[in-house]
Amino acid sequence: MVYLRHHRRDKEDSRERAVNRSYITGVKLTSEHMVDVMRAISKRVGVQIIDYSVYPDTESEPWRMKVFIEFDGEISDRYDLAAIFDEELSRVNEEHGHMLRIGETSPSVVYVLHRNASKELREENAKKKISDNQVKVIRYINSQSLLRDYMKRVKKAYGEGA
């Protein structure tokens, strides 16, 4: 289970904030929630998803999710991926929809990554001499440096403030 929290240098502050943030937002996501959401998005837009990652943007008030998706093809401009993501996540996790309705969570932002972005990120991690068992798909972005690495690979953004 992924508890949405903000990564901080001070470990005690981080733990306290993580516990408080998860109760404040009420949104606890499982990997199953995200797999269901990604399948639904893929079906709605008619393009397969290669990979995805999420970042809980707690610097935004109220907090929001930044979602990075790599598709196996082009997405039509008629789709608002941010709205689709929030609709589908609200369907599988009612708390997300509730928090959106009462203003405790801002609408999500979805970033479409350029082709092969996920592969590039894994290769960069391998070059950093991370052990082989740690070079894996990153589902939860937990640092500003990793967020910057993802932002460098954005092809298009959807959502308010994107």
For each feature predicted by the language model, list its residue ranges.
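AMP-binding adenylation
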Residues: M1-A162
